[in-house]
Amino acid sequence: MTQETALLPTSPEAGDLNVPARKVFVKTYGCQMNVYDSDRMSDALSRDGYVATDVLEEADFVLLNTCHIREKAAEKVYSELGRLRDLKKAKAREGREMLIGVAGCVAQAEGKEILRRAPAVDLVIGPQTYHRLPEALRRARTGERIVETDYAIEDKFVHLPAPDKAKTRARGVTAFLTVQEGCDKFCTFCVVPYTRGSEVSRPVAQIVAEAEKLVEGGVREITLLGQNVNAWHGAGPHGREWGLGDLLRRLGEIEGLARLRYTTSHPRDMDDSLIEAHRSMAKLMPYLHLPVQSGSDRILKAMNRRHTAAEYLALVARIRAVQPDLALSGDFIVGFPGETDEDFEDTLRLVDAVNYAQAFSFKYSTRPGTPGAELEQQVPEDVKAKRLEILQALLIKQQRGFAEACVGREIDLLLEKPGRMPGQLVGRSPWLQPVNVDAKASQIGDIIRVRITKAGPNSLFAEMIGETEARS
């Protein structure tokens, strides 16, 4: 996934009004956390005098916020950097300067190697040092080539600017909020512990303050983010240890915040308090992304997942017992080293047993530096491709079945943005599906009562039937 993120205009006090403002173009690859990080870097640069452009050729600074989760991710970045190098040279011939920066997990993994392989790059900055971006960019403008890839994660959240009310309102009625970063699980296929570091949880007060700022800016729904978001822990009142369930309950007390979600979860960190939140919290949407990766105990052990297929299924049953309306999503990897036809059949059996509302599935890709890269019995590409085709066909069938079962249901719908057709808006169902409905643009941010009338391939259609809970 890529997303182009443009900064919003800076305020006049950000710089001399007689000097043309510098323009920045941010391209975001990968997960929701990168989208969140791009927004926060954008806020920091905006306060330093940068303004938006969604036209690459206009940019004085181009920043690629990268993802390293899949094979050849770094090579794709280098390919993009080659194109940017050519643009930089063309602008230099016209007497115009353009700096290039690389952020995100490729920056963390590659570090100085990026400067060696891509001499046009001026700045490399890892995920834990985004608060240093404005200063690093000032240094880069003097000709210094910058690499900032240490793990000062505590400083990052302390020093990044709080969400700006005007910018928040312009970004929409839903928002991401990172509460946890890093991973201590060390699954053998995954680079995250090496690019994002150890698990670190943000303090309660800091999270609540940011959530309140978002709500002040018109946000109605917040999704809490973390590499292992349900590993979040912090100190509550009187020093009591809090888990994610406690944090959700505290955020649920914020007036004006209508909905909460969280992602991504690890099965081992789904504790009783969090499961209970799915029963008792009306604001917590009945949707859970709970990756399992494989249905084979042998492969799960090789992946270092530290749970069995039976334990995963038992956990799903516990959660559905308290929230029968739950939509479950998952992640799957096919073709992990040593995976046999029988192992793959175990995965299909698990998928049948769970009946996912949606899921994400991928062929195993070797990640340099991970234990999985050293394993023997690598599965041939054609075998991986065939297994992925079979698995995705089953998952698509389940997703369509879930969507069709929604037809006729009445739900509360948060209207998020204009639809593709005139007079149409799009919102998200409680189960995260896009829902199209005829409504006025002035109703964006409202929660309306609708009846689902049709299930399309990738979205639902609805008619309005009830009163509006207006956005304040």
From Swiss-Prot:
Named cofactor requirement(s): [4Fe-4S] cluster
Residues annotated to bind [4Fe-4S] cluster 2: C183, C187, C190
Residue stretches making up the TRAM domain: 404-466
Subcellular location: Cytoplasm
One Gene Ontology molecular-function label: N6-isopentenyladenosine methylthiotransferase activity
GO cellular component, one term: cytosol
UniProt keywords, alphabetically: 4Fe-4S, Cytoplasm, Iron, Iron-sulfur, Metal-binding, S-adenosyl-L-methionine, Transferase, tRNA processing
Listed SMART domains: Elp3
Pfam families recorded: Radical_SAM (PF04055), TRAM (PF01938), UPF0004 (PF00919)
Residue ranges occupied by any Radical SAM core domain in the UniProt entry: 169-403
Keyword Metal-binding part of the UniProt annotation: yes
Catalytic activity: N(6)-dimethylallyladenosine(37) in tRNA + (sulfur carrier)-SH + AH2 + 2 S-adenosyl-L-methionine = 2-methylsulfanyl-N(6)-dimethylallyladenosine(37) in tRNA + (sulfur carrier)-H + 5'-deoxyadenosine + L-methionine + A + S-adenosyl-L-homocysteine + 2 H(+)
Residues of the MTTase N-terminal domain: 22-142
Binding site for [4Fe-4S] cluster 1: C31, C67, C105
CDD domains: Radical_SAM (cd01335)
Reported function: Catalyzes the methylthiolation of N6-(dimethylallyl)adenosine (i(6)A), leading to the formation of 2-methylthio-N6-(dimethylallyl)adenosine (ms(2)i(6)A) at position 37 in tRNAs that read codons beginning with uridine.
Subunit description: Monomer.
Family, per entry: Belongs to the methylthiotransferase family. MiaB subfamily.
Matches recorded under PANTHER family: CDK5 REGULATORY SUBUNIT-ASSOCIATED PROTEIN 1, MITOCHONDRIAL TRNA METHYLTHIOTRANSFERASE CDK5RAP1
The protein's name: tRNA-2-methylthio-N(6)-dimethylallyladenosine synthase
Gene: miaB
